[in-house]
Amino acid sequence: MGSVTVRYFCYGCLFTSATWTVLLFVYFNFSEVTQPLKNVPVKGSGPHGPSPKKFYPRFTRGPSRVLEPQFKANKIDDVIDSRVEDPEEGHLKFSSELGMIFNERDQELRDLGYQKHAFNMLISDRLGYHRDVPDTRNAACKEKFYPPDLPAASVVICFYNEAFSALLRTVHSVIDRTPAHLLHEIILVDDDSDFDDLKGELDEYVQKYLPGKIKVIRNTKREGLIRGRMIGAAHATGEVLVFLDSHCEVNVMWLQPLLAAIREDRHTVVCPVIDIISADTLAYSSSPVVRGGFNWGLHFKWDLVPLSELGRAEGATAPIKSPTMAGGLFAMNRQYFHELGQYDSGMDIWGGENLEISFRIWMCGGKLFIIPCSRVGHIFRKRRPYGSPEGQDTMTHNSLRLAHVWLDEYKEQYFSLRPDLKTKSYGNISERVELRKKLGCKSFKWYLDNVYPEMQISGSHAKPQQPIFVNRGPKRPKVLQRGRLYHLQTNKCLVAQGRPSQKGGLVVLKACDYSDPNQIWIYNEEHELVLNSLLCLDMSETRSSDPPRLMKCHGSGGSQQWTFGKNNRLYQVSVGQCLRAVDPLGQKGSVAMAICDGSSSQQWHLEG
């Protein structure tokens, strides 16, 4: 009797275990499908404790198979194979097809993103708030060690009508890649944004998932980046201020090199190397080490690093003296920021403030360096998606204030280019002139002689020509394939409608001519399609309904980045669509972009 009881007891245990196994399997495998279509972070752990880890797209279900059963109906067997999340890390692996359009809603979101933000919001939302970025530092930087007693930083991020996902990815990149003891706080300054998700939804997210170290400051009217940063600095209590734009992603060990330089000399202001995040694909890529300069139109520009700056004992890790800063990303001692006069509060919104603070740093006893071992990615947009509240030309207004306070007699160099501005009003500058006297600042001639001797001067102030460092341009990308581009359904070739050298010309399908070199395409390692070694196949990022055209190769990917899929599709990365024959049986041979569906009209083959 006892053995029977034991046997049935064991059967019961086995049945119960099997039941729980099935229930847990169902729960963990299908819970994602039941999530609503909004941001639903799943908690994980990081250097600052629990944090939201996983992200579900807010407006579109995106390319995941489990969320898009219609993919099978569309016969797309290889949809975003590389878009997977590591179950341990919760980080999305980047795919060139992350921006693929699957339906009209995706198309609307993509087009709206370019209109509102001037970058691909569809990809931004699909990426979520966490992702790995490539470590773009020089190998020597990875061998450096930093003192344990570095000062803690307040990170100030001003934003106006920023994409929600881009803003939170900026914030989470700082949290994910900064030691907790070095991150005193993050201050978000909302410059009176119009978008609803940047109001209550942002507050709710911060309170729920980022309590403690995040402060959200709300401006009651549009102040602009300049005064917005001053407001953020006024609320900061960390020893060091770090200013970041609202569409950045910091890299590995980004903060320690900046803090170490400031710890060594509190009058040193430092900038990271700014890596490139493509506005079209959000791909993160390394930038060369360059330094800031300017021209007499008072516009910032990038300069090659002079040989005199490259021969230091520290080698590739040595700080690089920079005459100016780009302005979006820099760090300085908080007390020194206030001692030096913060920003010119008479400047409006944006423009010129980076040159003004650069001149003031150098002329008033400070130093400005770029730190090669610190890297931060930044979305470089082709246009500003918003203007000034009243439509005023803030760049001109701010440049005039800068010229009259800091350039001394050299302001005539500016007015020689803009004589129309000599009598234009620029407001009261007496406070800034008095600040210059109080700080005992040097002359602008001293700045040109000692900080930026490479700057050329015309007229009576002309000085001997400085050595010019010639940039011979990038090396041509490696050719991967060369041949005719066949449309498999029609057995025709993609060619120029007119001359292959005609910039802006359309491409069409015509009968293949094996003796015609003008039908030869090159596909290179930059994923460019180059016809007859002359022009690249290009798409408009903002008007995806436009047909592809031949344009000068710009080497920046995006609108000229094409990939060949497993189903012989030809996918355009920035548009998120595939190339198709409009009327395969017709005579015109027109081609256009369309949602990728695996149909025969979208099948291509590049010979070679």
UniProtKB/Swiss-Prot annotation:
| Amino-acid positions noted as binding substrate in the UniProt annotation, renumbered to this chain | 191, 222, 246, 350, 381, 386
Query: What Pfam family is a match, any one?
Result: Glycos_transf_2
Transmembrane helix in keyword set: yes
Tissues expressing this chain: Highly expressed in kidney. Expressed at intermediate level in brain, heart and skeletal muscle. Weakly expressed other tissues. In kidney, it is strongly expressed in tubules but not expressed in glomeruli.
Q: In which pathway does it act?
A: Protein modification; protein glycosylation
Q: Give the enzyme's EC designation.
A: 2.4.1.41
Q: Which Gene3D superfamilies match?
A: 2.80.10.50, Spore Coat Polysaccharide Biosynthesis Protein SpsA, Chain A
Domain Ricin B-type lectin, which positions?
476-607
Topological domains annotated Lumenal: 30-608
Chain residue ranges for the region called Catalytic subdomain B: 319-381
Gene Ontology molecular function: any one:
polypeptide N-acetylgalactosaminyltransferase activity
Any transmembrane segments, and where? 7-29
Known cofactor(s): Mn(2+)
Q: Which family does it belong to?
A: Belongs to the glycosyltransferase 2 family. GalNAc-T subfamily.
Q: Which disease is it linked to?
A: Defects in GALNT11 may be a cause of heterotaxy, a congenital heart disease resulting from abnormalities in left-right (LR) body patterning.
* Quaternary structure and partners: Interacts with NOTCH1.
What name appears for this protein in its UniProt entry? Polypeptide N-acetylgalactosaminyltransferase 11
Q: Can you name the source organism? A: Homo sapiens (Human)
